[in-house]
């Protein structure tokens, strides 16, 4: 796992026990999962808008910024649910080299 993700995961874990007024992340944990999910949704929409703007203008600065926000809030969500970023990286590694169509078909319930 990248050093940045490792360090960020450690900070997110530390903030779970911090006072809500001590950091933004601690305040999110204090507000609960619904607030965290709201932020993930908000950042998803902002990322989509930034992608459309980048496609039209060729300027990807906002796209990178909003994607970082989306990833960050997704990591907060995972942490709130007791999951580590490595679990997502492991899943991506598992999928590497698999046909996307075959992987999706394997998840479909039989009719």
Swiss-Prot record:
A GO cellular component annotation here is:
cytoplasm
Q: Which UniProt keywords apply?
A: Amino-acid biosynthesis, ATP-binding, Cytoplasm, Histidine biosynthesis, Hydrolase, Nucleotide-binding
Q: Where is it chiefly localized?
A: cytoplasm
Q: Which GO terms describe its molecular function?
A: ATP binding; phosphoribosyl-ATP diphosphatase activity
Q: What is its EC number?
A: 3.6.1.31
Write out the transmembrane intervals.
none
Pathway(s) it belongs to: Amino-acid biosynthesis; L-histidine biosynthesis; L-histidine from 5-phospho-alpha-D-ribose 1-diphosphate: step 2/9
Describe the reaction catalysed, as an equation.
1-(5-phospho-beta-D-ribosyl)-ATP + H2O = 1-(5-phospho-beta-D-ribosyl)-5'-AMP + diphosphate + H(+)
One Pfam family hit: PRA-PH
Record's superkingdom? Bacteria
Identify the CDD domains for this entry.
NTP-PPase_HisIE_like (cd11534)
Name the top EC class: hydrolase
List S-S links within the chain. none
GO-annotated biological processes: L-histidine biosynthetic process
UniProt-listed PANTHER family: HISTIDINE BIOSYNTHESIS BIFUNCTIONAL PROTEIN, HISTIDINE BIOSYNTHESIS BIFUNCTIONAL PROTEIN HISIE
Q: Which family does it belong to?
A: Belongs to the PRA-PH family.
Q: Which NCBIfam families match?
A: histidine_hisI, PRK00400.1-3
Q: What is the name listed in the Swiss-Prot or TrEMBL entry for this protein?
A: Phosphoribosyl-ATP pyrophosphatase
Gene from which this protein is expressed: hisE
């Amino acid at each position: 796992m990248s050093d940045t993700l490792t360090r960020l995961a450690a900070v997110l874990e530390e903030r779970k026990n911090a006072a809500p007024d001590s950091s933004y992340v601690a305040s999110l944990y204090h507000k609960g999962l619904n607030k965290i999910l709201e932020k993930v949704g908000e950042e998803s929409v902002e990322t989509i808008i930034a992608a459309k703007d980048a496609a039209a203008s060729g300027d990807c600065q906002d796209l990178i910024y909003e994607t970082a926000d989306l990833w960050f809030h997704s990591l907060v969500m995972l942490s709130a649910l007791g999951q580590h970023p490595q679990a997502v990286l492991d899943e991506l590694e598992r999928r590497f080299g698999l046909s996307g169509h075959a992987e999706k078909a394997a998840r479909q319930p039989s009719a």
